[in-house]
Amino acid sequence: MATVRRYLNRVDLNMNFIRRIKRRYVLHRYPIQHAAWSAASDRLEILHRLSAVEKAHLRELSTLFLYGKQFIGIGIDLDDEMRVIIAAQACLPILHLGLELLSGWTDIIVYPDAFYVNHDQVDEYGVVHQQERLLSGEAWSRGPIVLSWSDIERDISDCHSGHNVIIHEIAHKLDMLDGSSNGIPPLHYRMPIPKWTSALHDAYSELQHDIQHYKRTCINPYAANSPAEFFAVLSEYFFTASEVLAVNFPLVYRQFQQYYRQTPLDH
């Protein structure tokens, strides 16, 4: 048993060494050009709160993200700055988590505007109906992320609105890491699941209650559609309108601080 353990440890060390070599190679061989990074980071006000060290780390993550993903424009030509804008916002939630959380899928599909998709919906009698929906973004389990460029531009222009389609879809990807989409991503060690579920369930119930009683809400009502959408929408608020989240759902904000390992309200 000890021999097997030593062998596995040696394999882990070798794999880590190979990953570090590949990382250095990609960063050296395929760097984001200064003009593209400067233009993108200047436009993305949500990045301005980051320290110089965090910005440098985000640039590295974005470089590796661009190398590992395939960008597919449908009805739109994607230039370097557009790709960097997408990559930087996609990597912001995992800035202190690690790029490996965004592995297992490759494609990022971008439409010029909101796009229609067909989904099967089962009614109370078990009859399947096909429903056409207009979306600004979509994330598939082990599949692509689909985005609307016009919505990305809108998010950039109104960056403190609590809306960011890229962060929303990345949150879905994080939520799906354990194979289900239920608003509970794989949590860190010493993050008790009951504490997470209690904070989010209470906030979710409160939002649903306010909507059912026609009360005005400070949170996008779309969050009340499901626990998965609640997590994704509130992740948007955490990064773009953190004060709104902290004031309305302080326990959720604290859980997100622990999960994302970031404190946007302090900047």
Language-model regions: role of each:
Residues 27, 42-45, 66, 72, ...:
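Metalloprotease/metallohydrolase-associated module, dominated by Zn2+-dependent proteases
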Residues 51, 161-177, 232:
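Active-site recognition of the HExxH zinc-binding catalytic motif
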